[in-house]
Amino acid sequence: MAKTLYEKLFDAHVVYEAENETPLLYIDRHLVHEVTSPQAFDGLRTHGRPVRQPGKTFATMDHNVSTQTKDINACGEMARIQMQELIKNCKEFGVELYDLNHPYQGIVHVMGPEQGVTLPGMTIVCGDSHTATHGAFGALAFGIGTSEVEHVLATQTLKQGRAKTMKIEVQGKAAPGITAKDIVLAIIGKTGSAGGTGHVVEFCGEAIRDLSMEGRMTLCNMAIEMGAKAGLVAPDETTFNYVKGRLHAPKGKDFDDAVAYWKTLQTDEGATFDTVVTLQAEEISPQVTWGTNPGQVISVNDNIPDPASFADPVERASAEKALAYMGLKPGIPLTEVAIDKVFIGSCTNSRIEDLRAAAEIAKGRKVAPGVQALVVPGSGPVKAQAEAEGLDKIFIEAGFEWRLPGCSMCLAMNNDRLNPGERCASTSNRNFEGRQGRGGRTHLVSPAMAAAAAVTGHFADIRNIK
């Protein structure tokens, strides 16, 4: 029987399945950070259990770390306790930890792929909703809760029901300057923020194959923002070339054998999906969210929509509420909306290609008066690579702040946050009320679009800037 990629990955990891029971899956990789793990380790300690597979468990600090100093006291008492607990727990249970002084420290979903921890064909979990990022490699990756973190630590397995399948095909070639972020925002604009609920999404089509691994990670990172359980891109030569030579990737003949298997990780011809969505890449322009969920998104050259234009009463009410919170009026051009802060970073857009794209816009320009702009590399290696290329100097000369790795202003769990009423052009993944700080107003954009907003002081079409 013809199978989708998701069905192949799921079936390959079923350890035990009894009739009328939820299947038990084997977990190949478990990624851990300081926020969702303390209670899980406490549970192991209480029951006298070890970590079953410490060699398949990798930890880093990211969510509430300071991006201005490596001092764990810098972000308050709760952050300090969580980081100290992670240090203690990893030492006690034999888990490898990339702490603040480790050269590989960074956002968990940047670190995993970078170190070859993430490989095609794997099941990967983490106590974080954006674990879907790793699906870019043709891995089944999804976020889990703290009680599930404990279960995986103790057993290296997890009970998971089968999801429905969705194919999202982006046909044709994207125009120059259109990034994975624009593509995924356009997709969510079409499906809505709940369009993928109950599904695992496979992204395919020429525009997807044209993306680098970094672009594919951006795409899969935001699968959760359309309500999906996970996002997938089938592995290909782009994937294999990225993985080859990385720290935890197979070497020599083992790598060749792995690639032979990875090449089978494609949806079979004739396999059926529960839902199919199609977009034309050439119709996608630079995207900017205007509301309080990622599905409330328009082209940079559009006007703020009128809630009255929504036929669905629920959408209409949501739009009215969003505009009130965002302090926007219907009908005004998005390019006239001024911003206060810019955040370039997060597990969505903090990799080297993202920073290069932003630096290309920033080069030779200055951050607009009254705007604070942060650039936060996703990991130690990204920061080092950017500095080797001189990107840090470009940003600093333009008036951006060049920070240490961490989740930073993506979420209000550290010192980087918005004040009430402040408007931010952000390369992160969520624009809910208060996501970047109580009363903060978040607009999601690509790195180049964020840099353009920084130097102009408002939203601007990068195609007109270059």
Swiss-Prot record:
Organism: Escherichia coli (strain 55989 / EAEC)
Pfam families, sorted: Aconitase (PF00330)
EC number(s) on file: 4.2.1.33
Annotated PROSITE patterns: ACONITASE_1, ACONITASE_2
Catalytic reaction(s) noted: (2R,3S)-3-isopropylmalate = (2S)-2-isopropylmalate
Cited function: Catalyzes the isomerization between 2-isopropylmalate and 3-isopropylmalate, via the formation of 2-isopropylmaleate.
Disulfide-bonded cysteines: none
Gene name for this UniProt entry: leuC
Protein name (database record): 3-isopropylmalate dehydratase large subunit
Alphabetized GO MF terms: 3-isopropylmalate dehydratase activity; 4 iron, 4 sulfur cluster binding; metal ion binding
